[in-house]
Design a protein with these regions (language model features):
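Sec/Tat signal peptide C-region and signal peptidase I cleavage site
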Residues: 22-27
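Early extracytoplasmic/lumenal segment of secretory-pathway proteins
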Residues: 28-94, 220
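Extracytoplasmic ligand-binding site segments that recognize negatively charged/polar headgroups
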Residues: 38-43, 81-82, 86-220
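A ligand-binding cleft/hinge motif common to bilobed small-molecule-binding domains
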Residues: 92-94, 230-247
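Periplasmic-binding protein-like
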Residues: 111-114, 129-131, 200-205, 242-268
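A bilobed periplasmic-binding-protein/Venus flytrap-type ligand-binding module shared by bacterial periplasmic
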Residues: 132-139, 175-177, 259-271, 289, ...
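Mature extracytoplasmic/periplasmic domains
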Residues: 265-326
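Conserved C-terminal helix/tail region of periplasmic/extracytoplasmic solute-binding proteins
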Residues: 322-352
Length: 352
């Protein structure tokens, strides 16, 4: 796409999202924030973005992202439209190594309550989320696929499958389906034989997958509309489907827990406001409000001390002590340096 066409495309995207604006009465300046859309971004708006806009007295414009390729496209085109974007941790580290990010200004961004391992020169942890196996009870009753071996077992658990259309999480799921204990997944993937084993197992279910979804809002729509019967998707999205009245079951067992981070693309037009917004989004109360609105795991450990998260709600949060050890914590180091190669092989596999 020519540079001018790309600029127009990006501008059109922002116009399309102009309904998602948070504008204080006498706003001074603006910032453009992009995330994953759908009910998740609705929750971000009410719990975090609107309060931040009011506190900072700035206009917060919103857009949606489909991942690392969107950030790269803006930088390559010389048309950076986003000031802050949420991305998965491997993408954050990859973009950082590519020199595509502005450094985080820690004279503005307060890291109190944020684990040290989530504080990076060019990005910072934002939320913990888990992709779980969720199934419609009108198809399976109370006995749907509840682990990865059963997800792969179409003979005993027939039904339309949905999986994430990115390599992330799928190789891990394939190994667990093949009998590798959760705690040994990344040791197995550290070997050529282990990666080959994962590709082989993934290749067995790939032709049976009805939809390889691209975004979180799409996954919720697929489950809600019955276009899939069982799907690997974000547990927060599953909760939104349940809240809409659809009878769906899921569990954290064998879920893949990951961390999203916040970053500022190099060339951000509103860099100072970007840092100020990040600081607001990482505050303990903002993080707690999001967990109440949508049961995502806060990265700020102070969130559980605010009194905002009730005991009843806390057990639905993936980082709650009763849930944490049931899940596989995704290791970004497996992807860093080989994400492009793995993505290319994955895309070839699912397009066959």
């Amino acid at each position: 796409m020519k540079r001018e066409e790309r600029r127009l495309s990006l501008a059109a995207g922002l116009v399309a999202s102009s309904l998602a604006l948070t504008v204080p009465a006498f706003a001074e300046g603006e910032v453009v924030f992009s995330s994953w859309g759908g009910s998740f971004q609705d929750a971000l708006r009410s719990a975090m973005l609107a309060p931040a806009a009011s506190t900072l007295n700035i206009t917060v414009k919103e857009d949606t992202t489909n991942g690392i390729q969107d950030v790269r496209a803006q930088i390559t085109a010389g048309a950076v439209a986003w000031d802050v974007t949420e991305q998965d941790l491997p993408s954050c580290e990859t973009l950082s190594r590519e020199g595509s990010l502005e450094p985080i200004d820690y004279s503005i961004v307060d890291t109190t309550g944020i684990p040290k391992e989530l504080i990076h020169e060019n990005y910072i942890g934002f939320i913990n989320f888990t992709k779980v196996i969720a199934y419609r009870k009108d198809t399976f009753g109370d006995n749907g696929p509840s682990n990865w071996a059963e997800f792969w077992d179409l003979e005993n658990f027939p039904g339309k499958r949905g999986m994430h259309g990115k390599v992330n999480y799928n190789l891990e799921a394939a190994l667990m389906a093949d009998g590798v204990p959760m705690q040994e997944v990344y040791d197995t993937l550290a070997t050529d034989e282990g990666i080959a084993r994962a590709w082989d197992k993934l290749g067995k279910i790939a032709p049976e997958v009805t939809v390889w979804y691209r975004g979180g809002s799409q996954s919720a729509q697929l489950l809600r509309d019955g276009e899939v019967d069982v799907i690997h998707m974000g547990h927060n999205r599953v909760e939104s489907v349940i809240a809409s009245g659809i009878d769906v079951a899921y569990a954290f067992d064998g879920g893949t827990m990951d961390i999203d981070c916040l970053l500022v693309p190099k060339g951000s037009p509103n860099k100072e406001n970007a840092m100020r917004l990040i600081n607001e989004l990482l505050g303990a109360e903002a993080q707690a409000r999001l967990s109440v609105t949508m049961p995502l795991g806060p990265v700020n450990t102070g969130a559980f001390d605010t009194g905002i998260i009730s005991d009843e709600m806390a057990v639905k949060v993936n980082t709650h002590p009763t849930n944490y050890d049931k899940q596989l914590l995704v290791d970004p180091n497996f992807y860093i340096g080989q994400l492009g190669e793995l993505t290319e092989e994955f895309d070839t596999l699912i397009q066959q």
